[in-house]
């Protein structure tokens, strides 16, 4: 009981020291460098796009 305050203080300080720093602020225009391009197979056909999104579901379940 005598050392409770000291132990709690040490745990709090160690927890704050182990936390990661804040990421840097974005200045200017944000451009992601590792962007994954979308597959062109779906194209502009809404039926193909719908099937690509729904996977194995039939059309009534998806809509």
From Swiss-Prot:
Keywords: Cell inner membrane, Cell membrane, Lipoprotein, Membrane, Palmitate, Plasmid, Signal. GO terms for cellular component: plasma membrane. It is a lipid-anchor. It is found in: Cell inner membrane. A lipid is attached at residue 16 (S-diacylglycerol cysteine). Transmembrane segments: none annotated. Residues 1-15 form the signal peptide. A lipid is attached at residue 16 (N-palmitoyl cysteine). To B.suis ORF12 in VirB region. This is Putative conjugal transfer lipoprotein XF_a0011.1.
């Amino acid at each position: 009981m005598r050392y409770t305050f000291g132990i709690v203080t040490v745990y709090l300080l160690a927890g704050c020291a182990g936390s990661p720093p804040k990421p840097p602020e974005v200045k200017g225009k944000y451009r992601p460098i590792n962007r994954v391009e979308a597959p062109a197979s779906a194209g502009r056909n809404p039926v193909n796009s719908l099937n690509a999104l729904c996977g194995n579901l039939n059309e009534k379940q998806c809509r």
